[in-house]
Amino acid sequence: MSSISIFGFFGLATGRRVASQKPGASTKSYHCFYTTALQCSSGVALPAELRVYSPFNDSVLADNTVAFVVAKAHFPRNESVLLEASHIVPLPGDPSSDEYDNNLPDSPYPFIIGLGSVPSRFETLSDGVSKAFNVVSSEFVRDGLKTSSLQCIFDGSRPRWSRTPTPNVNSTIQYFGSFAGVTQDGIPRVTLDSIILNVGHNEPSTAATAPTPIKKWKFAAFAAPMYVHVPFSPDPSSLIYSQRW
């Protein structure tokens, strides 16, 4: 039970489209590869290579295109990060224009969400209040399962972490945050925004269904009310008419 996913805005360059054919397969598949960088709040940028499936008649993006990316990730020690993208949404505009950068979202540091195990106890960082612990996670990247080590940080300057317990050794956690930098050992650091401790197995449950609201806009700021009622009954007192907010 393990995973690593990254999402955020990335600059893409040196795109190339590559064909591959698995042993025994009768057809070729195509992927686009891009050079990119994973920017950290400390000012460090980790070099990365992004791969995404390329459909028929697809073309590569222009150099310096900024796109919103959702990808699985692998962090080999002291090597380029490998990103396996499932979604790439290029932002509108001309990347060669001087005005292109002015219209981009001010969100340069990608977010990470993962599930992994904690192999050792936490350590207190040099500020005397922040705590750090390593997490080991695996993900299917570049046609194989690959394992990565990350260091998660409880930022001591944020009061919300003052009473949060650190994970137990060998426990499984879910973590969410943004990239802060790299340790001296070359392990990426993640400043946590959220953590779930002692993640365990739960039996699957059936999700409740509800009518789909009418779509009016591509992005909605307000949700349309949803009405749910039971079928007609001879007894009026048994009718239910509820409004969910």
Spans of model-derived segments:
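OB-fold and OB-like single-stranded nucleic-acid-recognition modules
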Residues: 1-245
